[in-house]
């Protein structure tokens, strides 16, 4: 899903807190 990929990239760039269930939810930023 393109929307999920965009969210994951944005969250990966922030790296504020650990990412849980990265594949399922994207992240908890």
UniProtKB/Swiss-Prot annotation:
Keyword terms, alphabetized: Calcium, Disulfide bond, Hydrolase, Lipid degradation, Lipid metabolism, Metal-binding, Myotoxin, Secreted, Toxin
Coiled-coil portions: none
Bound cofactor: record note: Binds 1 Ca(2+) ion.
Posttranslational mods: Contains 7 disulfide bonds.
Cellular component GO terms, alphabetical: extracellular region
Top-tier EC class: hydrolase
Names of required cofactors: Ca(2+)
Family from the record: Belongs to the phospholipase A2 family. Group I subfamily.
A single GO molecular function term of this UniProt record: phospholipase A2 activity
Residues annotated for Ca(2+) binding in this entry: 28
Coarse class of the protein's main subcellular location: secreted
Function: Snake venom phospholipase A2 (PLA2) that has myotoxic activity but no significant neurotoxicity. PLA2 catalyzes the calcium-dependent hydrolysis of the 2-acyl groups in 3-sn-phosphoglycerides.
EC number: 3.1.1.4
Protein name: Phospholipase A2 acanmyotoxin-1
GO biological process, one term: regulation of muscle contraction
UniProt catalytic activity: a 1,2-diacyl-sn-glycero-3-phosphocholine + H2O = a 1-acyl-sn-glycero-3-phosphocholine + a fatty acid + H(+)
Cell compartments where the protein resides: Secreted
Signal sequence, renumbered to the chain: none
Source organism (scientific name): Acanthophis rugosus
Summary of the tissues where the protein is detected: Expressed by the venom gland.
